[in-house]
Amino acid sequence: AKAASRAVFEAFSGPCQECLASPQEYASLGLENMEFGQLLCETMVLWGKNHVKLLEGSEHLSIFLKMMMAFLQHSNANVALLTIDFWMFLVRESLLGDTSDPVEKRRLLRIPDGFVGALLDVIVSKMQKPVLDTLDDSPAEYYESVKDFHEKTAALRQRLVDISRSLAKSAPEEVFRACLGN
C-alpha cells in the first residue's frame, strides 16, 4: 500500500508541478485549465489527508507542501478553499497528533523547518480584503457575479482565520517565532 500511495503521489505531482511551474502560474491556472486544476487540487487534498505521512522525512514532503501552498495562493477562492481541510489536518497532525492517544504516546508529523512561518505568510496575504468593482477586473473570470466573488473570498478568509486560531492554540511558540521572522 505504501508503494502504491507513493506511485499515486508521483503520478499526480508531475501535472501539479507543470500547472504550477512558474510564479505567474502559481497565481493563475488559466480559465481554460480551471476545471482540471480544481480536480487536481481535490485529488491532492484527498491524497494528502490520507497519505502525507508516507512522505515524512523525504524531499517529497517539501514538494507536496509547496504544491498545496501554490493551490492555497491561487487567485480563485474556490481553489484555495479546496485546500482548507488539508491545512486543518496538517496543523492537527503536525502540532497535536492523534488526540485519542495519551499525550506521551502521540506521534507528530515532522514538517520542514520554517513551514509554519511560510503558511502564516500566505494566510496574511490571503486575508487582505480583495477589491473587485466590476467583472472586468481580475480574477473576476472565475466568478458569476461581484456578489459571488465577495461571498467566496469572505468564506475563504473565515476559514483562514480558523487555521490561524488552530495554529495559535496548538503551537503558540512556533507562531510567535514565525511572527518574529525566526
Residue map of PLM features:
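Long amphipathic alpha-helical scaffold regions
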Residues: A1-L81, F86-L109
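Alpha-helical repeat/alpha-solenoid scaffolds of the HEAT/ARM/MIF4G superfamily
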Residues: K66, H74-N182
